[in-house]
From Swiss-Prot:
Pfam families, per the entry: Gp5_trimer_C, Phage_base_V, Phage_GPD
Disulfide bridge partners, by residue number: none
The name this protein goes by in its record: Putative type VI secretion system protein VgrGB
Consequence of gene disruption: A double vgrGA-vgrGB deletion inhibits the ability of RhsB to inhibit cell growth. VgrGB alone restores RhsB-mediated cell growth.
Family stated for the protein in its record: Belongs to the VgrG protein family.
Lineage: Bacteria, Pseudomonadati, Pseudomonadota, Gammaproteobacteria, Enterobacterales
Function: A Vgr protein that is probably part of a type VI secretion system (T6SS). May be required for export of proteins involved in Rhs-mediated cellular contact-dependent growth inhibition (CDI).
Transmembrane segments: none
Domain of life of the organism encoding this protein: Bacteria
Region (Disordered): 449-469
Amino acid sequence: MANSTGLQFTVKVGALPDTTFAVVDFELSEALNQPFALSLNLASSQPGIDFGAVLDQPCELLVWYEGELQRRVSGIVSRFAQGDTGFRRTRYQAEVRPALWRLGLRTNARIFQTQKPDAIISTLLEEAGITDYAFALRHDHAVREYCVQYRESDLAFINRLAAEEGLFYFHEFEAGKHRVVFADDAGALAKGPELFFNLATQGLSEGAYVRRFRYAEAVSTAEVALKDYSFKTPAYGLLHNKMSSELAHQRESYQHFDYPGRFKQDPSGKAFTGYRLDALRAGAMTGNGESNAAELRPGSSFTLTEHPNPAFNLAWQVVAVAHSGQQPQALEEESGGEPTTLSNSFEVVKATTTWRAALPYKPMVDGPQIATVVGPAGEEIYCDEFGRVKLQFPWDRYGASDDQSSCWVRVSQGWAGGQYGLIAIPRIGHEVVVSFLEGDPDQPIVTGRTFHATNPSPYPLPASKTRTSLRTSTHKGAGFNELRFEDQAGQEEVFIHAQKDMNTVVLNNRSTSVNASHTENVGGDQTVVVQHNQTVSVKENQVTEIQGEQTVAVTKNRHTTVDDNESLQVKKNIAIQSQSGDVLIATAGGFIAIDKDGNISITGKGLVLNGTRIDLN
């Protein structure tokens, strides 16, 4: 193929012979944190190429100069189209994307727990069959206790997670394959070539060069302040600030404040604040230009030389580049002898600047959701020291409905103070209503409970609609405790059921008023201890029935007053004994007295002794 410039473009597609396609022209768009897009216009002598041999198959574009390889780009064919057929050739068009692009076709909702961001990204890549990836990380990234991919593509989730963690990614190419590399610092980027500045329009005979270069500065955010809250340290202000060090040409008063900052600990807050500042200032100092250097790609740098402004003759990091190549010789009947050309336009920042992506949209949960309380096998109640529980969401296909299904989730209670309030721990199997703080799927909180077909209400409805009940269930048993209110007119009732013990503590007075009858039934023993006085007042009759023995112990005096008659009937013996004093039995007209020495005195109007036998000594 005749070519006066020494340039040549070739392409390999799947298992097809290398000569199947000729490259007519191509457009290659590359940028940090984006899957590249390669558009190929092709020509072939075959008018009916099998789409199955091309679509979703590997494809590699090679750029040659004087027989030496200058650049390669490999990926998979995401779109393939057949165009017009000429005298000897048929036109085709192919769109080539990296394997990472496939993750944009996979939408999911899932939970990652206690994993670092690079481990989460690795899982997603490997599930998509991508094993050629690398991490060039220079900073520590904390373990994420709970990280949710919520109704978003795997690619969108990776982009979001990478942006939150200050990561950026780019592609590197080797023979027949490409690698996605994740980095967090400009120091990890590969150093590229020196490119001299050349205003003239020349070929590659003198080497690759930059023919246009422009530099701009823009007033941008000067400072970032991020704040968050942790219930574990409620009084501590999780606030972090970061001021840019490159504010010579603008004011320092442009502060970006945001809440929540999406962190719960100081190390993460400090790092996230710096990442946010870098992202907001990504456009503060930028350059752009045009060149004929095929090797320019994101993830690398080049050093500009021979520019009239010496301030520009330094190392620049490529943020984005758009390559364009034309090879009209591929269409021999239409070429008109035009040469093969390659050019590009690029966007750069200083090589010492770490470029970071702006935070993309994070999916929000539009409203409350239903979940089921879960825990380890054999348990009925499972919580931590804060009363938090584990949940299984209906949309989580990976959870096993056990103690690993979610993070510990806080539970809203009706009243919560310092060691006082109302607490009721949702139990395993209960259905709960879950809300999300700020709509963030990473921050669930239980705000309600609901019955369902498997867990019905304590009483059948609507038959018992007038009842308000607080009924518990014995842990690993069949009993219950209950406080119930019946509000049916004429049947109003307050009912208390204690499955075992009932303890009442009153630190001051207690009053009980019963307008009708009061019945108490004690199945075992009863003990009443009164520290001071006790008064029992019965306005009518009192009946005391003791089927066993009765013992009355009085430490001091005992007084019994009967306004009418008193009758004492004993079927066997009666014993009256005064151990150290006198005994006196008296009426209005006389008495019988026995003193402590045993002397008996009888006083009265008369004395009658009747008996079969009377002995007097």
